[in-house]
Amino acid sequence: MEKESGSGPLNAPYEECRPALWERLVYSLWKDVRHLAGYPEQLKQAISLGALRPVTLQPPPDTFWMRSVVRWDTWMNGTYCESACTLNYRSPGYDRRFESSAILVPELQELVCRETVDNFSCDITDVSGMAASKSVDYDIQDIDQFPELCAPEYISPVSELRLANNLTHRGIRWDEMRFADYSWTSRRLYWLNCDGSHHLAAARYLAVRTGKSVPLNGTLYRYTLKPDAVKKLQRNWYIFAVPDEEIFHTFYDAMEGFQCPFGHSVLPENLHAAQSCKDMLALIWLPRWQPKTASVAQLLARAGFPDFNHVLSRHALQTTIN
């Protein structure tokens, strides 16, 4: 007689590995006891079994392009489905099921100071970064390397005449110049261009070598990450980076089982360069005023999940150094 589908030695490894019914019942009881005692046992089990694994934050290549600037200035500014400075928040509700709500985080409203300077002026050599170019995909660290690699014909010979020729390029748009200053970056001043990147970079290169002053005038947008606001945010929230695809699966189930509330948000743009879908990260927010969140934060930290508050501290420190 032919054996039934699913029977036989092929199923043996699964049957051997699968916990017996009494073992599952004992673990369920143990989990409930641990949860009542204030320890996130289900989350610990998910991490131990590899269902929830930490992913290291991978910053994008360090370049003079704005694609390397962490955009604290636009982070949590709101989208078509979410208001600015609000979290997608889950908390215990009816029948121990999580309920969804939007919670405002006032500290985010104070995180970045924005200032507009209409009659800004600087020298061309003060510009250290650019926003756009047809060569933006090249990972170039220093603005002086840009014309050497991508437009050598624009910087030879080194002369004031060659400098003047570059400055006449219409893509520079002298009457529409805009700049951005980011307090947490080492390069600080970026030209918010649409065109003319090769010619202005070449002109800057030649101005340095000929000693010629080239004044630039336009509008400056200054963004300052406020250390006091960072500290205030850190006093109220534990924040960790968790694989995005697991937040509303493994992590959600564990937090609902533990009856521990949490918030969810995106990362700041350009903070993390995911290599695959599995490497994509999002943030989970744990309110410090809730009694159960400290044990969750301790477990995530010990397991190696990136502590977002450390990232905030590092960038706030860079602001004070600059």
Short names for language-model regions:
Residues 241-322:
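C-terminal interaction module
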Residues 2-39:
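Non-catalytic protein-protein interaction scaffold segments in large eukaryotic complex-forming proteins
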Residues 169-173, 208-213:
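Secondary-structure boundary elements
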Residues 197-212:
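Short active-site loop/helix that positions an aromatic residue
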Residues 29-190:
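Short alpha-helix boundary/capping and kink motifs at helix termini
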Residues 20, 24, 34, 60-63, ...:
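Alpha-helix boundary/N-cap detector
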Residues 193-194:
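Active-site neighborhood of thiol-dependent amide/isopeptide-bond enzymes
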Residues 213-240:
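Charge-dense polyanion-binding interfaces
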